[in-house]
């Protein structure tokens, strides 16, 4: 794979996948779980009441990527399938839910939510730009290589999600405390690096090929 794709391009693509993996949270049912947020949504007539507690944002994100015409996800079909699988598995949940547990956005607010989703996606793409995602043929032609690539990216995604959700790894500073996004990201990188160093994880690496 290393010889089939530029390493810096692959890094950008993995960063982008990690950055957008929670796009499925841009849904009124998920956001409405928090009482305060639901009241705010109600004020803008963007809320959607439901009795279902089975909504899974990672599965909804997979559905969103299927409908690429809605927000312009840029990948060839084969690579798109891999990315959908990675994102749908990042919480390792058993799929024992019924079809009705998947909550479509109601027609009267679906267009406005679609615009919100596009805005979030485009904002992520602006901060973490990457070329069209087209994994090399060897990923699809060799099952062992495909397995390693898919699970390698999934592992990076799960680790990054854990770090971003870890109160010990992240301080309380938000983007509002900085003059621009670049300064914010530079600061967070320093904070996370210090945390990982303290956990003896900065020297971790894949074993050499034998």
Where in this protein do the model-derived segments appear?
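Accessory nucleic-acid engagement/destabilization modules that flank
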Residues: 1-201
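N-terminal pre-P-loop "Q-motif" helix
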Residues: 199-210
């Amino acid at each position: 794979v290393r010889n089939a794709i530029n390493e810096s391009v692959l890094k950008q693509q993995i960063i982008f996948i990690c950055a957008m993996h929670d796009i499925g949270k841009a849904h009124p049912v998920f956001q409405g779980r928090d009482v305060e947020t639901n009241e705010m949504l109600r004020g803008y007539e963007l809320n959607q009441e439901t009795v279902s507690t089975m909504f899974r944002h990672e599965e909804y994100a997979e559905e969103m990527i299927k409908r690429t015409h809605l927000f312009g996800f840029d990948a060839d079909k084969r690579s798109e399938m891999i990315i959908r699988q990675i994102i749908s598995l990042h919480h390792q949940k058993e799929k024992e839910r019924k079809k009705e547990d998947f909550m479509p956005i109601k027609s009267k607010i679906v267009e406005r939510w679609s615009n919100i989703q596009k805005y979030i996606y485009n904002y992520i793409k602006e901060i973490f730009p990457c070329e069209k995602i087209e994994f090399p043929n060897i990923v699809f032609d060799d099952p062992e290589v495909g397995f390693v690539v898919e699970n390698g990216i999934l592992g990076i995604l799960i680790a990054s999600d854990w770090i971003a959700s870890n109160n010990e790894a992240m301080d309380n500073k938000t983007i509002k405390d900085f003059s621009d996004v670049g300064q914010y990201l530079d600061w967070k990188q320093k904070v996370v690096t210090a945390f990982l160093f303290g956990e003896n994880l900065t020297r971790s690496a894949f074993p050499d090929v034998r």
